[in-house]
Amino acid sequence: MRCSLLTPTSYRFHYPNPFRSLESIPPLSNSRYRIESGSPSSFKFSAPSLQRHSSVSVKAFDDDTFDFYTGDIFAATYAISSSEGEESDGDYALNVVTETTAQKLGKFPRGRKKHRIRYGINLGLLAFLSLLLLLMDSFAWKIVRLPLPPYFLSMPFFTSAILVTLAGYIFVPLLDRLRVHEPIRTLGPVPHNRRPTIPTMGGLFFVPIGVVVAIALNKVSSIEVLGAAAATVAFAAIGLIDDSLSLYSENNNGLSAKIQLLLEAAVGTCFAFWLETASLSSPYGMKMLVPLPSPLGLVFLGKLYLLLTSFYFVSMGNLVKATDGLDGLAGGIAALCFVAMAIAVLPICSDLSVFGASMAGACFGFLLHNRYRASVSMGDTGSLALGGALAAMAACSGMFFPLFISSGVAVLEASSVIIQVVYYSTTKRLKGKGRRIFKTIPFHHHLRLNGLKEPMIVTMAYVISSLLSLSAAYIGLISA
């Protein structure tokens, strides 16, 4: 391959060009490269260099370190391409500020981020959710035994998904310009692929859209939907406080764990007492009932129902938060959980089904911006809000068991943290030295240390969550 320096008009700069002539570009002088005597403006790679570039094995799920260069992303770069008239295998970007030789060519940052992971995972998730909701729309009237509008569940899902997708192209650059960036914490040995300047607080734009669409598509004001929306906003406010303190405090620490748990428990307790006094629509004629599969049937919990409600509010918020460690993991799992709950509560409260479908669409729309190589993260503003919304749906309908099943992956993530802490404390007390079961926690980071790539982990989580969501939806339908 013959490589020649480009003309000044071919240079690609990410910042105003600080170079005014070709003479300011450092010469490429190294013993591994041979300059042709007949062409002073071109050079040829030697055999060792070509062998080094041609022998690299690349897989679709491999991490690309070029895409997340942590140096000065505004440094000027220029490209070396093949000779005119030839097709190039790709351009090499040379950083003329930090490097003076072509010996370190493979270590230079590229001019722009190249998405090497296709949309296959997200398209598969969209196909699964769409087919499931369309199937339920065709049989919804048989389940509810009442006439329902066409596309009863599909309409809120696609409406929220489209609106959130479009809103992301406005709010993500705005968050980036306002420097609402996720603080970097080195808490473990796992190198995170997110670049240091990724915007956070994505929940500020996708959670309100999901809530507003759910309320707007309910022609009659539903007290269950309004209560679930209020709980969602309350948990989003807790997450917003935590994110704000993390961004603007000196040590980048948000709310302490105790204060955050107290606030979540307070919201859950208030919601439980509201349930006791509110007149909810129920096919059973009474409240505080938990539908379970036969032979258990309906179980009346009485005052224990209030404690169970508070427990689920605290648990679900932290379960979703625990899964928000990989790009697309929390958003995809939450979307599957919302669809499962939308189907499970359909015989009890069809208005809540619209709320669940709308929130699922909002999660999927956000997922298009939060997929692998994410451009934004939901932050605690989004993760706590999603957990609060799921808990509110379960509390208003009594579908705690289907929610537990559908959130099985999140339960596994949180359980790994609890098991690790308990085992470490016990072994340290008994043997004087603490031991660990997992290499690190949560469990998805343990898998990364064992060699699994991030997209593969997320794909596995989606498949498992899909199966669990189908099981949860079926159990909810046969229990109601």
Swiss-Prot record:
This is Phospho-N-acetylmuramoyl-pentapeptide-transferase homolog. The keyword Cell membrane does not apply. The keyword Oxidoreductase does not apply. The chain crosses the membrane at residues 121-141, 155-175, 197-217, 221-241, 255-275, 288-308, 328-348, 349-369, 385-405, 457-477. GO terms for cellular component: membrane. Belongs to the glycosyltransferase 4 family. MraY subfamily. Disulfide bonds: none annotated. GO terms for molecular function: phospho-N-acetylmuramoyl-pentapeptide-transferase activity. It is a multi-pass membrane protein. It comes from Arabidopsis thaliana (Mouse-ear cress).
